[in-house]
Amino acid sequence: KFADKEENRQLVWNFLQPYLSDEREFFVRFGTVMLLSHFVDEEHIDSVLRLMEGVRHEGYYAKMVVAWTLSVCYVKFPEKTEKILRNGSLDNFTQNKTIQKIRESYRVSKEDKQRLNLLKRK
């Protein structure tokens, strides 16, 4: 795949950045799905989490893809991702959907699911 070849990764990363702040919901969704598919790794996790905190689109599909991405980040990097859920930077919908998606995962322990459930907002 083009995006996964080492010589293309920085090019793809740079290409995706404007999509994350676009006014068009499905452009935001595209950029976020690409990050999820190609950049949730040790090298990029801090940047991906920071970018997810910065997505500020009000559309349902944009918010859902951020929640989906954060749930996958949690499975792979639980401590780093939980900090995002604890720091209050997400809107209520995205926070709660992220927790819901994490709790639906078979790759997360029962104890983690119970602890994260306490972070849900009203």
Predicted feature residues:
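Alpha-helical scaffold domains
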Residues: 1-122
